[in-house]
Design a protein with these regions (language model features):
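C-terminal regulatory/interaction regions
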Residues: 59-142
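Metallo-beta-lactamase
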Residues: 1-55
């Protein structure tokens, strides 16, 4: 994000999933993390839902202004160690940039030099979680 501070990496990441939607659902997937599995369409939807849930939660939370560090608690409900904070902050900002690109969030440079983020819609409904429990069966169908 520092090299391209206005980048929208989450939009690119979500767009990349469209290329995988053409794969037959019985394709064997060999992921970089986790065990091989069959069920690409279900897994793609889980990943998309996970990020859309975060986007909804951030939009709901930002009906009052917050900076990205404050929003880490919203996205990551566990304690982050020092090595995780920078990565988590990048992910949080990526979500905020996508919300700005969608016209749902505005950013303001405050007097202290820190950006605050505020939802355009002040009446955002409380988010309803799309993402269900990760289906353990996906990894067992190999």
């Amino acid at each position: 994000m520092a090299i391209e501070p206005e980048a929208n990496p989450l939009a690119l990441w979500l767009e990349s999933h469209e290329r995988f939607k053409v794969l037959p659902d019985d394709t064997l997937i060999l992921p970089a993390h986790g065990l091989p599995f069959i069920g690409v369409q279900e897994r793609l939807q889980q990943l998309i839902d996970h990020h859309e849930d975060h986007l909804d939660t951030l939009e709901y939370t930002c009906t009052t202004a917050h900076n990205s560090v404050e929003l880490l608690k919203v996205m990551f409900r566990r304690e982050l160690d020092k090595s995780q904070i920078v990565l988590a902050l990048g992910e949080c900002i990526a979500h905020l940039h996508l919300l700005m690109a969608r016209g749902k969030m505005v950013r303001k440079l405050e007097d202290d030099g820190v950006y605050s983020y505020t939802s355009v819609n002040k009446n955002v409904p409380e988010p309803i979680k799309r993402e269900g429990r990760v289906n353990e069966e996906i990894q067992l169908r190999v």
